[in-house]
Amino acid sequence: MLVFGFAFLSLLLIETEAQQQNGMMGGGAAGPGINKMERGCYDTPPIQRRARRQCGGGMLVPRFFYSNRLNRCIMRRACFFMRTGMRSMIECNKECRCMQPPSEGTGGGALCEREVMRWMFVGEMCVQRMFSGCGGNGNNFKTQGECMKFCKPREPEFMMGEMPSEMAAAMAFNNRGRNNFGGSPGGWGGSPGGWEGSPGGWGGSPGGWGGGGNQGRRVNRGGGGGGGARGGGGGGGGNGGAGRMNGNNQQGGNNQMGPTAATPPSPRPTMTTGPVTRPIPSVRRPKPKPKRWNNNNNNRNNNLMIQGTTSGGWGGTTTPSYYNPYQSYIAHEYLFK
């Protein structure tokens, strides 16, 4: 309890001194009416040194402060429970530098009497103002691009990750509908909130099913059927939603082959195009006749096989010209039986 009480008293002391320092540096009167820029933008070295002694080296966290001397945001170490300073460089530039009131500078001296055009962030946009050349504050940029870089206007909520409910409903799918681009059953379904169903699947054999619409405050109609291939009939649309239940889908009719276009006639020759070249027709060649068996050659081969190779003619031992077991057996039976 003593440790927590000491930390609470130290926090009150640090906050009080921070408000006094901010009031001395031009942040306005310290009190409950100070804004975020006057409370946490300016660097206070005495407070930082005391926070380092009380928090310890391991309990310091990075914080970003705006420096009037450097005219930019810098990083300092602060105690983790101190509410002074910004948590990021972007927040420091946006809250500390860009939210300062536009200033035309201070006069005095030859160098401070010239008038130059500078860009200043006023009312969520960058505008041109006259600047004397001396004094002023951080809300002073040489070019419009530099001003927009540091002081970019805040984006809408749905650009920061929060999508409106209507947009989210339009992008959702129906429970009954299934994604299909090939023609089988299953087109895009209706979205939650009663939006009209999208068309069914494209082309294919049977038409796609239309998605059934959900119950909602707007249109309760199912999606249209998918288109057929080559001009075929499309599928039927889904039923509208009723009550809290999704509408039932209806199967589309079968696609029919559309009529094919007639072949256009060949163009006539003109002076510019010249004669129309046509392909040369192919010449039909007759098929070759099959070779017939020559009986004379067959008898001659048999005689050569049976006839012996010795000079003794038919009386000696015969040796066939080529070996054929069947023919050799017949020759042996005929000659030596």
UniProtKB/Swiss-Prot annotation:
Alphabetical keyword list: Disulfide bond, Protease inhibitor, Secreted, Serine protease inhibitor, Signal
Amino acid composition bias (Gly residues), ranges on this chain: 183-244
Main location group: secreted
Protein name per UniProt: BPTI/Kunitz domain-containing protein 2
GO terms under cellular component: extracellular space
Pfam families attached to this UniProt entry: Kunitz_BPTI (PF00014)
Stored Gene3D superfamilies: Pancreatic trypsin inhibitor Kunitz domain (4.10.410.10)
Chain segments annotated as coiled-coil in the UniProt record: none
